[in-house]
Amino acid sequence: MAKKISGYIKLQVPAGTANPSPPLGPALGQRGVNIMEFCKAFNAATDGLEKGTPTPTIITVYADKSFSFVTKTPPATYLIKKAANLKSGSKEPGKISGGKIARSKLAEIAEIKMKDLNANDIEQATKIIEGSARSMGLEVTEG
C-alpha cells in the first residue's frame, strides 16, 4: 500500500548549499521533516550542478514524516542571464534594451528546460524561452 501524503512543499534551493537556516529550516520543520536528512540528500542529489544554482524543488511529505523530493531544472531567467552574462534584466523591458542574446543560445537553454516545459518539440520550447528573454528586456538576434 502507498504511503499517505501529508503535503507538498515547493521551494527554490541553491544547489549544493542546502542548510537548516531560513527559508528551508522553518518550511521543513513545520511539516516535521528531518531537516538535516533532507539537506544531506538534496546536496548529494545536486552534486553535479554548479554550486549556488537556484533549483526548484518539490518535496512530498508523508504522514509518517518521511519525504521524497524532485528537483527541476534551473529557472529560465537564471539560465538566460548566465548565457547573456547579465546580472539582471532591463529595468524597463520594451523601452530600454537590457542586452542581446543569440537565438542559438536560447535553443541550448530550451534543450535544458525541455523536460519542464509544456512543449511538444524544441522549436516550441525555444519560442517559450525567447518570450522569457524578451520579457527581461533582451533583444533576440539571429545566429
From Swiss-Prot:
PROSITE patterns: RIBOSOMAL_L11. One or more lysine residues are methylated. The keyword Transmembrane helix does not apply. Signal peptide: none annotated. InterPro entries: Ribosomal_uL11, Ribosomal_uL11_bac-typ, Ribosomal_uL11_C, Ribosomal_uL11_C_sf, Ribosomal_uL11_CS, Ribosomal_uL11_N, Ribosomal_uL11_N_sf. One of its GO terms (cellular component) is cytosolic large ribosomal subunit. One of its GO terms (biological process) is translation. Gene3D superfamilies: Ribosomal protein L11, C-terminal domain, Ribosomal protein L11/L12, N-terminal domain. GO terms for molecular function: large ribosomal subunit rRNA binding; structural constituent of ribosome. Pfam families: Ribosomal_L11, Ribosomal_L11_N. Keywords: Methylation, Ribonucleoprotein, Ribosomal protein, RNA-binding, rRNA-binding. NCBIfam families: L11_bact (TIGR01632). Forms part of the ribosomal stalk which helps the ribosome interact with GTP-bound translation factors. Belongs to the universal ribosomal protein uL11 family. Part of the ribosomal stalk of the 50S ribosomal subunit. Interacts with L10 and the large rRNA to form the base of the stalk. L10 forms an elongated spine to which L12 dimers bind in a sequential fashion forming a multimeric L10(L12)X complex. This is Large ribosomal subunit protein uL11. It comes from Sphingopyxis alaskensis (strain DSM 13593 / LMG 18877 / RB2256). The gene is rplK.
